[in-house]
From Swiss-Prot:
Binds 1 zinc ion per subunit. It comes from the Eukaryota. GO terms for biological process: endoplasmic reticulum to Golgi vesicle-mediated transport; protein geranylgeranylation. InterPro entries: PGGT1B-like, Prenyltrans, Ptb1, Terpenoid_cyclase/PrenylTrfase. This is Geranylgeranyl transferase type-2 subunit beta. It comes from Bos taurus (Bovine).
Amino acid sequence: MGTPQKDVIIKSDAPDTLLLEKHADYIASYGSKKDDYEYCMSEYLRMSGIYWGLTVMDLMGQLHRMNREEILTFIKSCQHECGGISASIGHDPHLLYTLSAVQILTLYDSINVIDINKVVEYVQSLQKEDGSFAGDIWGEIDTRFSFCAVATLALLGKLDAINVEKAIEFVLSCMNFDGGFGCRPGSESHAGQIYCCTGFLAITSQLHQVNSDLLGWWLCERQLPSGGLNGRPEKLPDVCYSWWVLASLKIIGRLHWIDREKLRSFILACQDEETGGFADRPGDMVDPFHTLFGIAGLSLLGEEQIKPVSPVFCMPEEVLRRVNVQPELVS
């Protein structure tokens, strides 16, 4: 007898239309009260939070509502002498926040706000002999950081600054028997890591190394009866996996393998009709993180009210065309 799947029940009165105006209002007002508890407690990831907010506003055609000059000044203040960029002023630099900052500056076509050569040196300094990347000087190794490194350098037009061949070797060593990828060699396959690794391989033109059918099957197995997607077996669905899983499927040319309409219904059910924004699951609290990935997931599903999104960079396709960054995808 099979084990019941963990899932959620979508109520009959759950939202079923896209509340775009409410989402734009929610993001535009988020952080306007700097003494809010939620805002204060998210300081440790502020740079990524700004990236989530700006990207979703751009996808909705509402970027003009955000305070461009204040954001550019903030980013400049977060670059350290080593070249790396931190989540907030006074915090330590990290590859995650360095990528977020470069993505924001690319959105605004203002990359010269920071010292680009210093950023390149910082990324170079974090590559290890086996080709892997640490996230910061403290040394944690993770395929997320391999993606952050090549994505940052690709946006800067400096991908040749690192040992790309060794970086590819390391990421491929993290491939598992099920076609997926983990954070390090031998680690369990996880949708978030798969997104990072397929994105990495797209940027480095190595997608031919992936068994797209095997990986596509594993990713499609993430869809539950509710229509939502989870990140690994026996976990609840979460709107953020509408991005990690969908983007990976798009990269390997297998997006048509899932039930798109059921997923769309699940994503829409995670909206808050009163405040705007998306939650991880229907009825939970909304936040900018899930709002971006809900909207980005709907873009991949072909939602006409949202700009086309790059499945590799989670940025508007028009921005990547402007900077001439077009990673390969499996057709």
